[in-house]
């Protein structure tokens, strides 16, 4: 590195020329002493320059190491955030499962209640309508029959009484008794009809309550569907955010691997060129030493 090439060229003594056998030996030059002094000075300068370059390289590596530590601390924080995001995502999935299960149970219960109430309502409505029709027909038939009976009895008895007695007093007494009996029968019939009407009103009130309950259940079902749709939207958004976070983590991991590879190459170039430098290394912490060793 640095002055390595110049050290080879300027720090070695000049080679001696080979003398021929027939030539007499030449005397050694008198300037050998100063030449050896210059060579030692040059070696010292080259060693100092090389030590300075090694020191700068190690300082640069340590600075890069500090930057890497900061980046890795940020990366650890990001990974913690991603881990927290994954835990939140798992909790969200569990809550979604519980929500879906509760919604399914509630929906099934709602459908069962709705079906039972609808069936009960239809049966009560049909029975009530049948009772109304039957009572109406009975009343109409009874009224027609009573009218015909009254007309027939009154006309026949009136004519017979006139033929037998020639007086109307006894006839009217009998007619009053007959009318009293008819009125009693009608009163009993009216009481029976009143009871049935009260029963019909009770059934009608129950049907109204059932209709209100069905309406309430339908509204709750619509609310549950709306909440389910909102939950699905939030779930999709969280899934998209998680996917983006994973992509960012993958890019950061690739960048870190590339940085690690560049660091190893730089350390190999710096430390592999001269395994035993002839200068004191700067003081480094145990963490930096372990980093350089890796």
UniProtKB/Swiss-Prot annotation:
Residues 47-270 form a coiled coil. GO terms for biological process: spindle midzone assembly. Residues 1-43 are annotated as: Disordered. The keyword Coiled coil applies. GO terms for cellular component: cytoplasm; midbody; nucleus; spindle midzone. Residues 20-29 have a biased composition (Basic and acidic residues). Transmembrane segments: none annotated. One of its GO terms (molecular function) is microtubule binding. Keywords: Coiled coil, Cytoplasm, Cytoskeleton, Lipoprotein, Myristate, Phosphoprotein. It is found in: Cytoplasm, Cytoskeleton, Spindle; Midbody. A lipid is attached at residue 2 (N-myristoyl glycine). The modification Phosphoserine is found at residues 152, 239. Belongs to the CCDC69 family. May act as a scaffold to regulate the recruitment and assembly of spindle midzone components. Required for the localization of AURKB and PLK1 to the spindle midzone. This is Coiled-coil domain-containing protein 69. It comes from Bos taurus.
